[in-house]
Amino acid sequence: MYGCSLIYGFTGSTNFNVIANQLGSSEYAITFGIVFILVGLAFKISAVPFHMWAPDVYEGSPTSVTLFFTMVPKVAALTVFIRFLYVPFLNLIDQWQMILIFLSIASMLFGAIAAIGQTNLKRLVAYSSIGHVGYALAGVATGTNEGMQSSVIYIICLLYTSDAADDWS
């Protein structure tokens, strides 16, 4: 919310087109707003280093809720990531690209390594989900239409596999 407040405060609008047109006048201030919004979205999708809540929540939830948590909030937040970064802030790719590359690589590595030692299936699903977020963010981090499309296709494939896992359980 603070990031949205900063962007609105410096641009005077919530319209993405108006924000994109006003980037030159207060670019550094808007960058702070972007960083705060990215942190909030990274927490929502449980990307490393904002992932600490996911394994405990997944473990303590019923199986159907766990499978819901693995996809629905992540699909929504990744869609917001794409819409938020590609429409008004594609010109500021130098500011947000390195953040997403770090989140992506850290999530892929940590998700895979942490999943190896798990004996609880739900915690394994949580760490696997963290790794999958890293793969989806890798496409977004490219800043290209092809990268965005690959992330969308990856998310769609995850939806189908998550649905299959739900049917299996």
Label for each model-derived stretch:
Residues M1-S162, S169:
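Alpha-helical transmembrane segments of multi-pass membrane proteins predominantly involved
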